[in-house]
């Protein structure tokens, strides 16, 4: 007989922040161009916010699913919820039972949208600097190897970047991207992120009208960059306001993430995850 459908009480949807990328006991590995996080769905870090929220709700790992997917954008998550899979140049994820699982969840948290600007920026940097090999140079940082950025890790990053042999033309293209291109990407992504989030809420509400849903807000992923020169500050502040209004419109909770402590790789520290868990649990109590 076919195995009974697993029923999770708490399902966490989102990107690498949800997955706990960068935490020492997160379970993930690169498989060619893609990440394999299947072992993380229930083997997630004890320090990630999903573990702490589950603990706060009195739930075990058997009752909790961490569906955090590295490099996932809001449109990808919408496709994943609608069809059970999503694939592009940088992602390849499949959760064929997701819709059925969502129907039975009591709590669903959604943290998505930061990659709507970060992934296009990475592609822009790769394009400006000569293509796919740029990702190979920067991947150790994205994978959490440089979270503390000590002397040896900085030297390794410098060696990786020096090996690219950037031409004057590529340097010019990169400077243009950094000067105005990032701000343009931020502006262009606002409407699509909100549209995808609204469609996602409609899907979740249709699948499970009784579930408690929490939209998790955004933080500045590059806090060391001063505010006047940091386009992310304005972008995520504006997006937070818009997403909070969207949450009110659809009668779901909103958990602010504005003061999340971040490591050098733009992912939360263990303390950052603890803060996010507190914010989510607080939102669920309202």
Where are these regions (language model features)?
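Serine-esterase "nucleophile elbow" of acetyl-processing enzymes
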Residues: 2-69
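Flexible, glycine-rich phosphate/dinucleotide-binding loops
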Residues: 19, 73, 222
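Catalytic-core regions of hydrolytic enzymes
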Residues: 69, 74-104, 193
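Alpha-helical cap/lid subdomain in secreted, periplasmic
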Residues: 92-270, 274-285
């Amino acid at each position: 007989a076919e195995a009974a459908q697993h029923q999770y009480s708490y399902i966490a949807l989102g990107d690498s922040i949800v997955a706990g990328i960068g935490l020492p006991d997160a379970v993930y590995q690169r498989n060619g161009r893609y990440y394999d996080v299947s072992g993380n769905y229930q083997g997630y870090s004890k320090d990630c916010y999903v573990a702490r929220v589950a603990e706060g709700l009195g739930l075990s790992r058997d009752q909790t699913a961490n569906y955090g997917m590295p490099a996932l954008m809001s449109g990808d998550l919408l496709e994943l919820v609608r069809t059970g899979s999503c694939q592009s140049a940088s992602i390849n994820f499949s959760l064929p039972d997701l819709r059925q699982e969502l129907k039975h969840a009591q709590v669903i948290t959604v943290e998505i949208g930061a990659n709507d600007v970060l992934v296009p920026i990475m592609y822009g940097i790769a394009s400006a600097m000569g293509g796919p090999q740029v990702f190979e140079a920067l991947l150790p940082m994205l994978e959490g190897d440089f979270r503390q950025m000590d002397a040896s890790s900085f030297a390794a990053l410098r060696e990786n970047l020096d090996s690219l042999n950037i031409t004057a033309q590529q340097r010019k293209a990169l400077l243009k991207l950094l000067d105005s291109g990032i701000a343009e990407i931020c502006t262009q992504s606002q409407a699509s992120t909100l549209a995808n989030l609204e469609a996602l809420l409609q899907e979740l509400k249709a699948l499970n009208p009784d579930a408690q849903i929490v939209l998790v807000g955004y933080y500045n992923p590059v806090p060391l960059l001063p505010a006047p020169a940091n386009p992310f500050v304005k972008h995520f502040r504006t997006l937070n306001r818009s997403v909070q209004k969207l949450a009110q419109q659809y009668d779901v909770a909103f958990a602010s993430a504005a003061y999340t402590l971040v490591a050098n790789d733009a992912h939360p520290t263990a303390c950052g995850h603890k803060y996010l868990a507190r914010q989510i649990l607080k939102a669920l109590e309202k």
